[in-house]
Amino acid sequence: MLKLFRPGWGEGDARYEAGKAEAVYAAGLPAPAVHGVTQVGERFGIVYEEIVGRPLMESLQRRPWAVHETGRFLADLHLQVHRGRVPSLPRVEDRLTRAIARAPGLSENERTALLALLGRLPGGDAVCHGDFHPGNVYLTERGPIILDWMDATQGNPVADVARTAVLLRAAVLPQGMPGRRVVELIRRAFLHAYLRRYFTAAPPAPEQLDAWMAVVAGARLAERIPGEEKRLLALVQGTLCS
């Protein structure tokens, strides 16, 4: 399986991600094996083992009545990730700090408040995937495999849970999409089941979640995802003003 980077991304970018993926795989986490970095024309890429299976997202779409079961499954898999330790990974706090510093849409007071809030939140050394959602989980014969470790860090696992929650809460469905209302309801039910299972099984205090979600939402603004700004700012301001 070849992951090609966009034009303009260099060999160093490919080797950086490959190094993360190799470290995560060596730690025994459910990630694809890395077979090296290659170049195709002017683009660099990473050669991964071939993954034969289907995305968890497809399973959710085929079996919407099993939304709670699928949410619990994702939570159990996330708990497995958070039991991993990879000391070579960068700190999640550093990644969030850089993103908040350049995020558009924040007032300077909000930016300062988010950075101060981040500084008060407890740290940790758990592996954090950084982009953990049903589209990055594949169901295979040897069990679930998690793709796309480019944003992997180490830190407080609740930061990673918050990232997943923000991705699900802030994503905007296209206007006029058939069944849009139903999809929104399924997504909310999925998120509820995922969070309930995670915090039932894990020791971290769920009261940290709102604070981490505000910080993660502020950082997400730096990615400039079309249509998400209003929801992300609501998450930030709802916590800072409470």
What are these language model-derived features?
Residues 143-188:
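Active-site Asp-x-Gly
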Residues 9-10, 55, 137, 154-156, ...:
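Conserved protein kinase catalytic core
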Residues 3, 17, 131, 148, ...:
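Acidic active-site catalytic centers that drive phospho-/nucleotidyl reactions
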Residues 79, 163-166, 219:
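Generic alpha-helical structural context detector
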Residues 1-89, 122:
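ATP-binding pocket architecture of kinase catalytic cores
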